[in-house]
Amino acid sequence: MNSLFASTARGLEELLKTELENLGAADCQVVQGGVHFQGDTRLVYQSLMWSRLASRIMLPMGECKVYSDLDLYLGVQAINWTEIFNPDATFAVHFSGLNDTIRNSQYGAMKVKDAIVDAFTRKNLPRPNVDRESPDIRVNVWLNKDTASIALDLSGDGLHLRGYRDRTGLAPIKETLAAAIVMRSGWQPGTPLLDPMCGSGTLLIEAAMWATDRAPGLHRGHWGFSGWAQHDEAIWQEVKAEAQTRARKGLAEYSSHFYGSDSDARVIERARSNARRAGIGELITFEVKDVAQLSNPLPKGPYGTVISNPPYGERLDSEPALIALHSLLGRTMKNQFGGWSLSLFSASPDLLNCLQLRADKQFKAKNGPLDCVQKNYHLAEKTPDSKPATVAEDYANRLRKNIKKLEKWARQEGIECYRLYDADLPEYNVAVDRYGEWVVIQEYAPPKTVDAQKARQRLFDIIAATLLVLEIAPNKLVLKTRERQKGKSQYQKMNEKGEFIEVSEYNARLWVNLTDYLDTGLFLDHRIARRMLGQMSKGKDFLNLFSYTGSASVHAGLGGARSTTTVDMSRTYLEWAERNLRLNGLSGRAHRLIQADCLGWLREANEQFDLIFIDPPTFSNSKRMDESFDVQRDHLVLMKDLKRLLRKGGTIMFSNNKRGFRMDLDGLAALGLKAQEITQKTLSQDFARNRQIHNCWLITAA
């Protein structure tokens, strides 16, 4: 009997133990990452040929303590390598693990290689050659703390390499994991199986091979035992012949069918090729079809199983499309596949929750470094009184109500950009803004007392409901997370897409960028203030301080201003402002753009203006400014400097976003100025619920 070890992906150890026991293995012991077992030579070959779950089958050769590199060398050399393989066989060493002595795996592999080679040369035998690509013998050494475990890898290449798959395309899951997913799905061979996002077909091919009794090792051309001195070719040929006979019989007797679809035609062609190479191509029908086109191939029965490894995303901007996909999949399952079973494997449990289905079972597994979950569902049969499932119903109803009220108003006003929802319901704490055909959802960062997982799931529900209610494509929805901005973060780029969209606001055309920055380039709550500036500016010299993207300058220019001067510290925003001005035919000497610290520029400037708009930050301590600025503390100093630039009879429109801002009216009077608050006049219908989003004042000479 041989002592053997079968490695596997984390989470599959018990499943592998059952498989090995069914093959005839004895004394199976589960450890993390694999199973120790006993078996004769035939069982060695049976496990290599038939295990669908093992990553590798190892023959342990011994262990040694490693306190120095010499210990490693001597421990390896103590093994009788000349009885394990012949000198004309090539070999390779795979070394993993480090300790205080062996700090580099390549160095460890070199010491092992030297020990093996010297074991031959000291017996006056030829030196065996190293072949890293396709060796006859693979030696595996695993160093754990101060113990090195040495084994012969009888698999050669990993057992997930079945020999049927085109290796040019990256696969999201290995064949061994795919087989485990099929086994855990609850699917019964002989019943229909469908994968609506099949990719290169791995799940369906593994299922078909299992169902038709086709050994996973049948198509492999190279093994790690080919140079092993104990290899018994006669027994191996018997095992191989038996596998071929069973495969032919299984294929001839199998009557059910498999269905696979994917939106990518190239991937589907690869799946067809893989299935043909696996010998089960005739059993699987592949179609180019996305989830939106999915229908039940057997509406009159029998019931089957839907299985898939749907895509998931690591980037925030990919989530709307994935949420839409999972929501659509859930609806399609309920509408088209009543009575069927569903099994999905994913690295994102949150996305699976978007199905709006309750799982009967779930399993955990690792896919490489990713923690994944497999959830199994039973899809209830549809009855005449079945109600369609809803997601975030209260939010969806409020959004519909707001749209009904605001869409007509926006058309009458001549605006394309407006707020549809602003945390109307406390549990759905987001803002939803429309920009023409696009929608931006801004999530207000939840307080630390709110469970992060629940908040994330609530956000996913909001996205799914928004897509349903507005009937927009997922690629037209942009997701942002808004929290208190500190220092430079309010100006930092989120992406580098550089996608600008042209929108209309009254008679102005403006560029917005929905993806690259936290803000879009257009503060929607200032819309009426900008229109007022346009109406006030005819024949006047207009100054726009802290100008952002210059939209107020555009309105002033279109309103007939004699000149506009646009000042901001950011070159990016000034270039954006220039684009906005040009888009409206406003260019030349009459429309100046100045990059400067606005407060410093204001102290030095000596020009005169009839109309000044200033919308300073609530607080700023930028390194490019000489000192910090607090709008509550410093607004009188600001007014003193502005008064110096204000032409007789001129007006300052002053706005800020500080909640609870108190204008120092006595201080203004001492400066010879008076203020009229116009906040309520500048709040439009879409901001009617948020009366404190900004405050706005007209300031003139007393």
Curated annotation (Swiss-Prot):
Give, as one word, the top-level EC class. transferase
Q: Subcellular location, in the record's words?
A: Cytoplasm
- Chemical reaction(s) catalysed: guanosine(2445) in 23S rRNA + S-adenosyl-L-methionine = N(2)-methylguanosine(2445) in 23S rRNA + S-adenosyl-L-homocysteine + H(+); guanosine(2069) in 23S rRNA + S-adenosyl-L-methionine = N(2)-methylguanosine(2069) in 23S rRNA + S-adenosyl-L-homocysteine + H(+)
Database matches in Pfam families: Methyltrans_SAM, RlmL_1st, THUMP, UPF0020
EC number(s) from the headed UniProt entry: 2.1.1.173, 2.1.1.264
Q: Which CDD domains match?
A: AdoMet_MTases (cd02440), THUMP_AdoMetMT (cd11715)
Boundaries of every THUMP domain copy = 43-154
In the record, what terms sit under GO molecular function?
A: 23S rRNA (guanine(2445)-N(2))-methyltransferase activity; RNA binding; rRNA (guanine-N7-)-methyltransferase activity
Ordered alphabetically, the record's keywords are: Cytoplasm, Methyltransferase, RNA-binding, rRNA processing, S-adenosyl-L-methionine, Transferase
| SUPFAM superfamilies linked to this entry | S-adenosyl-L-methionine-dependent methyltransferases
The cellular component terms of Gene Ontology attached to this UniProt record, alphabetical and capped at eight, are:
cytoplasm
Family, according to the entry, reads as follows: Belongs to the methyltransferase superfamily. RlmKL family.
Q: Which PANTHER family match?
A: RIBOSOMAL RNA LARGE SUBUNIT METHYLTRANSFERASE K/L, RIBOSOMAL RNA LARGE SUBUNIT METHYLTRANSFERASE K_L
Q: Which named protein is this?
A: Ribosomal RNA large subunit methyltransferase K/L
The organism of origin for this protein: Citrobacter koseri (strain ATCC BAA-895 / CDC 4225-83 / SGSC4696)
**The organism's taxonomic lineage, starting at the top:** Bacteria, Pseudomonadati, Pseudomonadota, Gammaproteobacteria, Enterobacterales
